[in-house]
């Protein structure tokens, strides 16, 4: 028997064994080994924090140093302080342990509750939630006790952050340990349709309730969930191995009636190139209720996100005893195909497909192997590990310890919970019936005094709540000892407090767009709702580095799963005075101010006319400057007629603005001082000697382009369906060549910004000003005006985004580049040719606009474009469509757009 025949026989045996059970699949109950915080397997360099009262890293590990990690700032009320652990590789974390500050038995700080956030790539952070949507985890009740908490569901993560909580200003300290094992499967995310609901005698919810990615337009992408949590469903899909969950919890299911194609398509992304031998899918076959095994599976492969699917797909028809109603694992041979991305289609053989787990048998492949025919996308930045030696998604690393036993969800636990609830109810009744003195007596009986002096804890010992005392302490409680101030050497004498609460300095102001608190959920599943793709990281400043060409640090996201808008990634476009701010390239310190020196403007020469808009920390005013020619020290334009005032826009920072807001305001001044172009508003001067800080820029006498064009009629009434209300022309008119001249000036100004690698991020007619002889200048304060509030989509009540002008990659990924400005220019050109009589995508709601961005990404021909304006020639409309190309590199540069509009547009038909 040859090697090829032997290999085929082994694979067939594997497939046959998989039909009965997923024997090689990992058991999450055994993945509970201490990962190394207490025994220092995790080095100091992998432990960091938002701030720390003491520089001692030993405190983060155990009872050394100050006895625990204590944040320098108060955790109340913002809850922004965190302790971060970098595991260097992906791990499945199933259990966490916490303890308060030790300090030789003198510490009294601990955290009563905390939250967890985790990341697989260091860019996108996700908040851990239990199966009912609760984020807050109960912590310690005293500084000595160790509290172990099972994470249900477990999380696949490389980086984990602990966020302690408090209900008032107080000192909080933590010692932590993580339990789990190495994630060997290499699966980073899967994309699948949203699970559906089966209606029997009761509703059976077959949604992926623990999925930690995003949901847009009925598609889940960018995360992991129940199909990769190690929990295999029961034969009766209405029952579950978990307690207090809804019917159907263990399975994700789809109805044949909802898929006209006859199959469910899923895509899987892995950490690096792998040679795939087989895929195991645990399916339900309770055919009496409509669940059937797949009729067949078809898989395609590719090695990179931007590459085409390679070769012929692997097809496998599933047979076997389909009449047996037991759930089972079916194995699909994959023939050793090499890929990072798999797209598999599961064919319906009955009314429903129900999956509880999907795993892969694969080996890591060297990227530079000659057998692969070239080089491919680099492996992720975490250290590579040896290939798996058996069919398991996890490698158990005992580190010389025993795994922590899992608390079984037995009837005894349920009975204890019921007894506790009854006791609490009785206590409440007694409290309502008895006097206050009796209530205090009951409370005093419940108080306990800690008599122990010193404690040594090993969090790897099994148990749920562990209290270990090494030796008896004194009868009187030890004196309180504060954590050492940073830089002070240790001392042995304890410090007795004066009885007042320790007020810690608040951290610097930072706007967070992620919302952590959610209302409690009942035993039912979450209500289906439109999930807006949001990038939930905000910055204290508003200047963002645009994308530059070159090799990325990490492989780009797969192109068949709608990308996330980076969680930890909402970019706020709004500056401190309400207008948008330019995204500027990364420059060395001080380079932003390399423009001409700013000119101090005499505040007394400004005469207020009206308020144009406002933001969180400032306002934009329209002012006049009388006799500007008298201000010889200022670089004013010379086209202001003598005796006429000069119109200027004045951005004013309120005196009560935060320090960060003041810094952002001064950054904006430096950036504006660099802009010198006839089609960009210029910085004329500043008032920064005293409050309020002001910057003075150009303003044009005809106002913004949107209001200007909407008051005009098109001269060429012969153009069929020209914008208008069908009545005789009233008011001023404008010609089609003049509209092209207006658009060419906008393209010229954007061409100048592109040469500086500046990104505008809010290009629209509302942000263009009109002067004499149809002179156009691009501005930046349209976002601050209440007049245009309907043009912006408000995210979580804070950030505003002009989604109707934004490219799809801006909406889904927060990626702003010069190419995304080209997209916005195409929409602006559409506005100009419509004479600003209609809002882009006016027939769509904001949610439908976001869904349309997802259609652009999926590129399946269902995306919607703006229609051709009646007065727009076909050749010019084709130029607009090029601006809205899916691939950013296919969009024309601004130099080409300006040349076409200035020279060739009149010749188009």
UniProtKB/Swiss-Prot annotation:
EC no.? 2.7.10.1
Asked if the keyword Kinase belongs to this entry, the reply reads yes
Q: Which UniProt keywords apply?
A: ATP-binding, Calcium, Cell membrane, Disulfide bond, Glycoprotein, Kinase, Lactation, Membrane, Metal-binding, Nucleotide-binding, Phosphoprotein, Pregnancy, Receptor, Signal, Transferase, Transmembrane, Transmembrane helix, Tyrosine-protein kinase
GO cellular-component term (any):
plasma membrane
Please list the residue ranges annotated as the Protein kinase domain.
606-901
Please report the organism this UniProt entry assigns to the protein: Pan troglodytes (Chimpanzee)
- PROSITE patterns listed in its UniProt record: FA58C_1, FA58C_2, FA58C_3, PROTEIN_KINASE_DOM, PROTEIN_KINASE_TYR, RECEPTOR_TYR_KIN_II
* Annotated region described as Disordered, given as residue ranges: 45-65, 466-495
Question: What GO annotations for molecular function exist for this entry?
Answer: ATP binding; collagen binding; metal ion binding; protein tyrosine kinase collagen receptor activity
Motif PPxY motif, per the record, lies over 477-480
User: Which domain of life does this protein belong to?
Assistant: Eukaryota
Please give the residue ranges for the topological domain Cytoplasmic.
435-909
The record lists the membrane-crossing segments as: 414-434
Q: Please state every residue range assigned to the domain named F5/8 type C.
A: 31-181
Q: How does it assemble?
A: Homodimer. Interacts (via PPxY motif) with WWC1 (via WW domains) in a collagen-regulated manner. Forms a tripartite complex with WWC1 and PRKCZ, but predominantly in the absence of collagen. Interacts (tyrosine phosphorylated) with SHC1. Interacts with SRC. Interacts with MYH9. Interacts with CDH1. Interacts with PTPN11. Interacts with NCK2.
Mostly located where? Answer: membrane
Q: Which InterPro entries match?
A: DDR1-2_DS-like (IPR048525), FA58C (IPR000421), Galactose-bd-like_sf (IPR008979), Kinase-like_dom_sf (IPR011009), Prot_kinase_dom (IPR000719), RTK (IPR050122), Ser-Thr/Tyr_kinase_cat_dom (IPR001245), Tyr_kinase_AS (IPR008266)
Residue positions of the PTM Phosphotyrosine? 480, 509, 516, 736, 788, 792-793
| Bias (Pro residues) ranges | 475-492
**Positions of the UniProt region annotated as DS-like domain:** 188-363
What's the protein called, per UniProt? Answer: Epithelial discoidin domain-containing receptor 1
Q: Which residues lie on this side of the membrane: Extracellular?
A: 21-413
């Amino acid at each position: 028997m040859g090697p090829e025949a032997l290999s085929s026989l082994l694979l067939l045996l594997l497939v046959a064994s998989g039909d009965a059970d997923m024997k090689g699949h990992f058991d999450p109950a055994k993945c509970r080994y201490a990962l190394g915080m207490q025994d220092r397997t995790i080095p100091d360099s992998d432990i960091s924090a938002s701030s720390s009262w003491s520089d001692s890293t030993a405190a983060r590990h155990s009872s050394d140093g100050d006895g625990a990690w204590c944040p320098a700032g108060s955790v109340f009320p913002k809850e922004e302080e965190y302790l971060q652990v970098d595991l260097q590789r992906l791990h499945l974390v199933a259990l966490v342990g916490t303890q308060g500050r030790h300090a030789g038995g003198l510490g009294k700080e601990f955290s009563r509750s905390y939250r967890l956030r985790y990341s697989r790539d260091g860019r996108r952070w996700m908040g851990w939630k239990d199966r009912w949507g609760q984020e807050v985890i109960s912590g310690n009740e005293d500084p000595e006790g160790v509290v172990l908490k099972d994470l249900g569901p477990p999380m696949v993560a490389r980086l984990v952050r602990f966020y302690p909580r408090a209900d008032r200003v107080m000192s909080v300290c933590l010692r932590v340990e993580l339990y789990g094992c190495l994630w060997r499967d290499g699966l980073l995310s899967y994309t699948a349709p949203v699970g559906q609901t089966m209606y029997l005698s009761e509703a059976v919810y077959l949604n992926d309730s623990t999925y930690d990615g995003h949901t847009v337009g009925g598609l889940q992408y960018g995360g992991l969930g129940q199909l990769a949590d190690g929990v295999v469903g029961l034969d009766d899909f209405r029952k579950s191995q978990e307690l207090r969950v809804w019917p159907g919890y263990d399975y994700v299911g789809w109805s044949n009636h909802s898929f006209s194609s006859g199959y469910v398509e899923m895509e899987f992304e892995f950490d690096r190139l792998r040679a795939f031998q087989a895929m195991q899918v645990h399916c339900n076959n309770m055919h009496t209720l409509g669940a059937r095994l797949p009729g067949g599976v078809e898989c395609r492969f590719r090695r990179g996100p931007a590459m085409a699917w390679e070769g012929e797909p692997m097809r496998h028809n599933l047979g076997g005893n389909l009449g047996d109603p037991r759930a089972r694992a079916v194995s699909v041979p994959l023939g050793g195909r090499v890929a990072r991305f798999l797209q598999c289609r599961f064919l319906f053989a009955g009314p429903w497909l129900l999956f509880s787990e999907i795993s892969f048998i694969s080996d890591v492949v060297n990227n530079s192997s000659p057998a692969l025919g070239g080089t491919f996308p680099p492996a992720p930045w975490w250290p590579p590990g040896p290939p798996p030696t058996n069919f398991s998604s996890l490698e158990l690393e005992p580190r010389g310890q025993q795994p922590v036993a899992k608390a079984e969800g037995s009837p005894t636990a349920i009975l204890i919970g019921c007894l506790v609830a009854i006791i609490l109810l009785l206590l409440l009744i007694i409290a309502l019936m008895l006097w206050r003195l009796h209530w205090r007596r009951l409370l005093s009986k419940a108080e306990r005094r800690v008599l122990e002096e010193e404690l040594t804890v090993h969090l790897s010992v099994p148990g749920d709540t562990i209290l270990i005392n090494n030796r008896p302490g004194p009868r009187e409680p030890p004196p309180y000892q504060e954590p050492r101030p940073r830089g002070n050497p240790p001392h042995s004498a304890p410090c007795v407090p004066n009885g007042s609460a320790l007020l810690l300095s608040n951290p610097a102001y930072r706007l967070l767009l992620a919302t952590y608190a959610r209302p409690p959920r009942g035993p039912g599943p979450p209500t289906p709702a439109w999930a807006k793709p949001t990038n939930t990281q905000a910055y204290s400043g508003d200047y963002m580095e645009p994308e530059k060409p070159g090799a990325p640090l990490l492989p780009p996201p797969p192109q068949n799963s709608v990308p996330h808008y980076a969680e930890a990634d909402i970019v706020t476009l709004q500056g401190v005075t309400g207008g948008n701010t330019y995204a500027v390239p990364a420059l060395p310190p001080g380079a932003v101010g390399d423009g001409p020196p700013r000119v101090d403007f005499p505040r007394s020469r400004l005469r207020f006319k009206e308020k144009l808009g406002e933001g969180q920390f400032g306002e934009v005013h329209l002012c006049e400057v009388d006799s500007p020619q008298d201000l010889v020290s200022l670089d004013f334009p010379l086209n202001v007629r003598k005796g006429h005032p000069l119109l200027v826009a004045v951005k004013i920072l309120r005196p009560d603005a935060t320090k960060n807001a003041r810094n952002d305001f001064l950054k904006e001044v430096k950036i504006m001082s660099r802009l010198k172009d006839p089609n960009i508003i210029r910085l004329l001067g500043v008032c920064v000697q005293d409050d309020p800080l002001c910057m003075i820029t150009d303003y044009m006498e005809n106002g913004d382009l949107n209001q200007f064009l909407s008051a005009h009629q098109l001269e060429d009434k012969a153009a069929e369906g020209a914008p208008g209300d069908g009545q005789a022309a009233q008011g001023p008119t404008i010609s089609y060549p003049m509209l092209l001249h207006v658009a060419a000036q906008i393209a010229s100004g954007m061409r100048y910004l592109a040469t500086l690698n500046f990104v505008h991020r809010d290009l629209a007619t509302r942000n263009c000003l009109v002067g004499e002889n149809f002179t156009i200048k691009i501005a930046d304060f349209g976002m601050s005006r209440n007049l245009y509030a309907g043009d912006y989509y408000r995210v979580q009540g804070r950030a505003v985004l002009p989604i109707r002008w934004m490219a799809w990659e801006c909406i889904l990924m927060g990626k702003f580049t010069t190419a995304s400005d080209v997209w916005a220019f195409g929409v602006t050109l559409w506005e100009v040719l419509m004479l600003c009589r209609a809002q882009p995508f006016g027939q769509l709601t904001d949610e439908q606009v976001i869904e349309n961005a997802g259609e652009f990404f999926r590129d399946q021909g269902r995306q919607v474009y703006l229609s051709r304006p009646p007065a727009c020639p076909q050749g010019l409309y084709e130029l607009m469509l090029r601006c809205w190309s899916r691939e950013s590199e296919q969009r024309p540069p601004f130099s080409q757009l300006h040349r076409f509009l200035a020279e060739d547009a009149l010749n188009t038909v």
